[in-house]
Amino acid sequence: MPDEVVTRFAPSPTGFLHIGGARTALFNWLFARHAGGRMLLRIEDTDRERSTDAAIAAILDGLSWLGLHWDGDVIYQFQRVARHRDVALSLLEAGQAYYCYATPQELEEMREQARKEGRPPRYDGRWRDRAENDAPSGVKPVIRLKAPRDGETTLDDKVQGKVTWANKDLDDLVLLRSDGTPTYMLAVVVDDHDMGVTQIIRGDDHLTNAARQMQIYQALGWSVPIMAHIPLIHGADGAKLSKRHGALGVDAYRGMGYLPEALRNYLVRLGWSQGDKEFFSTEEMIEAFDLAHVGRSPARFDFAKLENMNGHYLRHADDRHLVDMLSTTLPFLPKGLELAPKFTDERKAQLLAAMPGLKERAKTLVELLDGANFLFAERPLELDAKAQALLDASSRAHIAALVPLFEAAPEWKASALEAIVRAYVAETGVKLGQVAQPLRAALTGRATSPGIFDVLEVLGRDEGLARLRDQAG
């Protein structure tokens, strides 16, 4: 193995950082960190028509949010076009490539003939050994690799095992287009070589590219990096991942209230396993990750499992960390921008105090924020249908009777307030629920909330009593 492990994540900025790309980045990052190496980031932006600055920003932001920090500066493939062109010309000079003057019409005829014969379309090599003085006038040539025609190309893939292609089935691929721009196949090989990449970890939809890229490496006399083609992600039903399954941008998961550490943990378990262990800290992932435990079968994305895992992380998270996460994630959450002005230091302190009860009932930050809605609500509270039903005349009478008892409370603590209510229940003979539920409705506007005495304490004496007086009969 080389002295230093160097991996790379190389997305195309033609859209968001989707969940499959995020997992590929995670695997590259973990592999590099495990070996004490580096993960580089290359933006493959040679498709100028489809590449956008917004997509680049989304990729960088998504990786940063997930905590997958790359090493060194971002490398932009388009800025290296001159280098790619020089390499193509060097292959030409070495007799490893040639000018091809086949016209679009000729190429279409080759494709049509292949269709008729029921075989994959491939270039027939007609310009492979022809002299340049045969070139038709007015036709700009492409440069094609002079690929081996006999024998086999074999890849010892670290996930897929040994994969072999017959060279007769691999045609002479284009390296440089007629306008002088490099093809993806050439650019990837040159960039990986120049960046010192030692391990290529990518989706198995790139497996067919591997044979062609290996032939370019061999023509250049360069060593081929170790390759690992990881299985794609499918939906829970086994079908190819689509938006309904979860093929969304990483930013969408942030907006749905998932914690980055929970999403990292869920993604690492999609295709990689370490016994029956489900939950991994980042340090444990780095320590345990290897390619030997990556399976070959497509992993299945299951929203329910992700949600349950996120709930686990919420319940076990430090309360202050969750307040900070809510604060920074607020602009991305539904109605978060509306709440932002209310997210004062006083509200944050209340949120911190309420967090033990809130996080037990939530699986996402969206649910956590929804549960904390009572802290941001303004008087008079808007009551939902269930809360209105709870606040009948009898319930309002109980609230009216409790207000002076609460006013006389020597301290505004949950335990003291609970003692007052229990004494009232014992004296009047009503059931605790007949009092606690109307209190909840009056204080939160809902029929569900954290423990009602905790709610009273968190709201504080003045706000708590004011809300009760609003609903007292």
From Swiss-Prot:
Its EC number is 6.1.1.17. A motif ('HIGH' region) lies at residues 11-21. It comes from the Bacteria. Keywords: Aminoacyl-tRNA synthetase, ATP-binding, Cytoplasm, Ligase, Nucleotide-binding, Protein biosynthesis. GO terms for cellular component: cytosol. Gene3D superfamilies: 1.10.10.350, HUPs. Residues 111-132 are annotated as: Disordered. GO terms for biological process: glutamyl-tRNA aminoacylation. InterPro entries: aa-tRNA-synth_I_cd-bd, aa-tRNA-synth_I_codon-bd_sub2, aa-tRNA-synth_I_CS, aa_tRNA-synth_I_cd-bd_sf, Glu-tRNA-ligase_bac/mito, Glu/Gln-tRNA-synth, Glu/Gln-tRNA-synth_Ib_cat-dom, GluQ/Sye. Its main location: cytoplasm. It is found in: Cytoplasm. Monomer. Catalyzes the attachment of glutamate to tRNA(Glu) in a two-step reaction: glutamate is first activated by ATP to form Glu-AMP and then transferred to the acceptor end of tRNA(Glu). This is Glutamate--tRNA ligase 1. It comes from Beijerinckia indica subsp. indica (strain ATCC 9039 / DSM 1715 / NCIMB 8712). The lineage of its organism: Bacteria, Pseudomonadati, Pseudomonadota, Alphaproteobacteria, Hyphomicrobiales.
